[in-house]
């Protein structure tokens, strides 16, 4: 045994290979194995090696970039996902994998407010990976699981974004957190209903497959598959709602959190006819032949599969039927399968007894979208708009309604004591877009779920982060509660205030309490301010900001009565009038044609009579 000891003291012979050999012979496996045991996990597909991450409160284990589906590339483009086949060896799960192909926002290059939502990994169609964060050391008893679905209008988003870093929430609350990538844009939601080659909703099916993976594998990470809470924001929240409404998904989770989005939002779904129109329009734009209702669909999809991914992305926005804000090209389709009916119909007909749901919005849901196309708006000025710009903004903020309906919106949102005031018009258009697309669909969903047996909690998030880069006039924009839910202020490299760190800890506790019990309140402190359930009658919700909980009633009740009650009746009445007018005009046209024909016949007959008399 002398030679190895001598060699160990001979620097010239201490090559990396030799040191590795000596480490193996000297018991390094046992010593390192005790540390690595937390980072080695076996799931149904094979073995994974994770990474230990630091937080101010201690370490967590992270398993990043776990494959859960076969790459949806080539002939698999537009098709439902296929589970990942088992692998040999150990998959390196120490870093995030590629982001699904998508549109990249270049409106404000280098601006933190937009760059934070842009992909932070390379784009690829090989993107169906998920991530798991778990306490270090791993829980010895089953731990509640939170599963995150990102937003992004169904056209963008990635689970690898810094704002979705799960380490702080997991360390603070000792939960297990899972997030997944899913296909977006045409790759996830292009639909030719009735076609097996592009059935639509495959992005939702990606999410469902990840939920099935959680049921099969999360116990290996210390998670409890019988206590899974699905949570998401914006399009992620709409996705959560669609899983609530789709029976094959419903059994894969047990509680739901919908942040700033709902499946009944006017932007969240399209019908089969519009889905087909958009798909064939995209095909036309990229030089593929039009499809029909039969075999031509196969040819159209085959052609679309030959087009480079970036080419499809470049043309996606051109399929929208008109200029608009808060409308997206490829979204879930009411296909009779994943969604057996419209979300509104499914919500109204559903049985939600025993369901536990947390829903909410931020203070200024509409402001973010105005700088993406509303007349007169920009992040670089105060956006003090004119009356004419407000009127034009209503038409892009509420597309596809009649002139009478648009006039009703203008009437409701105008401050008639100051109808020309630019600041009031700016705030009014922000409210139009936010109420129409987020606040009132969420309020409608909360009321219906509560009326049908669900236990619902509701909030309005009202704190503007001290680090926010968007201008002050935008208030608390869409998406800017997320950093607090994930505990990002606890990152010592960031410049949040001490009060914001405490606030983030409060919010993480509310979300974790809900994941554990279905109730966000602190069970160990009955003297703490209580968050009451939201009921269809009382409509109680809480304000979330740096102050203690404040209970309020009626989530923008007047505005939502307009959107959820009055406007649908107006649209229905005008649709009836329009149909009556169409029928009257058609009958008048037929009568006029008949009279012209009768007159011609009569004239011909009269001439014949006169000739016979001669």
From Swiss-Prot:
Residues bound to huperzine A: 117, 164, 368
Region forming the signal peptide: 1-31
Binding-site positions, galanthamine: 117, 233-234, 368
Pfam families xrefs: AChE_tetra (PF08674), COesterase (PF00135)
Listed result of changing residue 206 to N: Misfolding, absence of secretion
Gene name tied to this protein: ACHE
Subcellular location: Synapse; Secreted; Cell membrane
Complex formation: Interacts with PRIMA1. The interaction with PRIMA1 is required to anchor it to the basal lamina of cells and organize into tetramers. Isoform H generates GPI-anchored dimers; disulfide linked. Isoform T generates multiple structures, ranging from monomers and dimers to collagen-tailed and hydrophobic-tailed forms, in which catalytic tetramers are associated with anchoring proteins that attach them to the basal lamina or to cell membranes.
E.C. code: 3.1.1.7
Family per similarity comment: Belongs to the type-B carboxylesterase/lipase family.
GO BP: acetylcholine catabolic process; acetylcholine catabolic process in synaptic cleft; acetylcholine receptor signaling pathway; amyloid precursor protein metabolic process; cell adhesion; negative regulation of synaptic transmission, cholinergic; nervous system development; osteoblast development
UniProt name for this protein: Acetylcholinesterase
SS bond list: 100-127, 288-303, 440-560
Keywords: Blood group antigen, Cell membrane, Disulfide bond, Glycoprotein, GPI-anchor, Hydrolase, Lipoprotein, Membrane, Neurotransmitter degradation, Nucleus, Secreted, Serine esterase, Signal, Synapse
Annotated GO MF terms: acetylcholine binding; acetylcholinesterase activity; amyloid-beta binding; cholinesterase activity; collagen binding; hydrolase activity; laminin binding; protein homodimerization activity
Biological role: Hydrolyzes rapidly the acetylcholine neurotransmitter released into the synaptic cleft allowing to terminate the signal transduction at the neuromuscular junction. Role in neuronal apoptosis.
């Amino acid at each position: 045994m002398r030679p190895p000891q001598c060699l160990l003291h001979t620097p010239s012979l201490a090559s990396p290979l030799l040191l590795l050999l000596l480490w193996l012979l000297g018991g390094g496996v046992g010593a390192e194995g005790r540390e690595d045991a937390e980072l080695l996990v076996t799931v149904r597909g094979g073995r994974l090696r994770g990474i230990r991450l630091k937080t101010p409160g201690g370490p967590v284990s992270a398993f990043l970039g776990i494959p859960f589906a076969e790459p949806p590339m080539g002939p698999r483009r537009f098709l439902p996902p296929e589970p990942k086949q088992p692998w040999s060896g150990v998959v390196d799960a120490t870093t995030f994998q590629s982001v699904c192909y998508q549109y990249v926002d270049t409106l404000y290059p280098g601006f933190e407010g937009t760059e934070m939502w842009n992909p932070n990994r390379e784009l690829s169609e090989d993107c169906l990976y998920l991530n798991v964060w778990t306490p270090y050391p791993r829980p010895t008893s089953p731990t509640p699981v939170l599963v995150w679905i990102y937003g992004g209008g169904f056209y963008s988003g990635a689970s690898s974004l810094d704002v979705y870093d799960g380490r702080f929430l997991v360390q603070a609350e000792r939960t297990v957190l899972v997030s997944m990538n899913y296909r977006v844009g045409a790759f996830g939601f292009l639909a030719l209903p009735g076609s097996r080659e592009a059935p639509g909703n495959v992005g939702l099916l990606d999410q469902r497959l990840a939920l099935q993976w959680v049921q099969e594998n999360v116990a290996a990470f210390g998670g409890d598959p019988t206590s899974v809470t699905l949570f998401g924001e914006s399009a992620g929240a709409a996705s959560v709602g669609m899983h609530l409404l789709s029976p094959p998904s419903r059994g894969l989770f047990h509680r739901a959190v919908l942040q700033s989005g709902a499946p009944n939002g006017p932007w969240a779904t399209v019908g089969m006819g519009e889905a087909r129109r958009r798909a064939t329009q995209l095909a036309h734009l990229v030089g593929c032949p039009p499809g029909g209702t039969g075999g031509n669909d196969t040819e159209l999809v085959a052609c679309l599969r030959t087009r480079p991914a970036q080419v499809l992305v470049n043309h996606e926005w051109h399929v929208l039927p008109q200029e608009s804000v808060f409308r997206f090209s490829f979204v879930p389709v009411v296909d009779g399968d994943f969604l057996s009916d419209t979300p509104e119909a499914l919500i109204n007909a559903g049985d939600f007894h025993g369901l536990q749901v947390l829903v909410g919005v931020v203070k200024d849901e509409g402001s973010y979208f105005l700088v993406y196309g509303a007349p007169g708006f920009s992040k670089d000025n105060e956006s003090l708009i004119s009356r004419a710009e407000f009127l034009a903004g209503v038409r892009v903020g509420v597309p596809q309604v009649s002139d009478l309906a648009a006039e009703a919106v203008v009437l409701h949102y105008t401050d008639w004591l100051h109808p020309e005031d630019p600041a009031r018009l700016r705030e009014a258009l922000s409210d139009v877009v936010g109420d129409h697309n987020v606040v009132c669909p969420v309020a409608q969903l909360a009321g219906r779920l509560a009326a049908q047996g669900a236990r619902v909690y509701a909030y309005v998030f009202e704190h503007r982060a001290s680090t926010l880069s968007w201008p002050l006039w935008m208030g608390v924009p869409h998406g800017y509660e997320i950093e607090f839910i994930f505990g990002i202020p606890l990152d010592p490299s960031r410049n949040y205030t001490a009060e914001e760190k405490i606030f983030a800890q409060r919010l993480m506790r509310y979300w974790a309490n809900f994941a554990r019990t279905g109730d966000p309140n602190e069970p160990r402190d009955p003297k703490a301010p209580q968050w009451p359930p939201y009921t269809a009658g009382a409509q109680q919700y809480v304000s979330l900001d740096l102050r203690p909980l404040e209970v309020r009633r009626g989530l923008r009740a007047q505005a939502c009565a307009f959107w959820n009650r009055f406007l649908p009746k107006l649209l229905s009445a005008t649709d009836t009038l329009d149909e009556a007018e169409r029928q009257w005009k058609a009958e008048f046209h037929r009568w006029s044609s008949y009279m012209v024909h009768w007159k011609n016949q009569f004239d011909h007959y009269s001439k014949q009579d006169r000739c016979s008399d001669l």
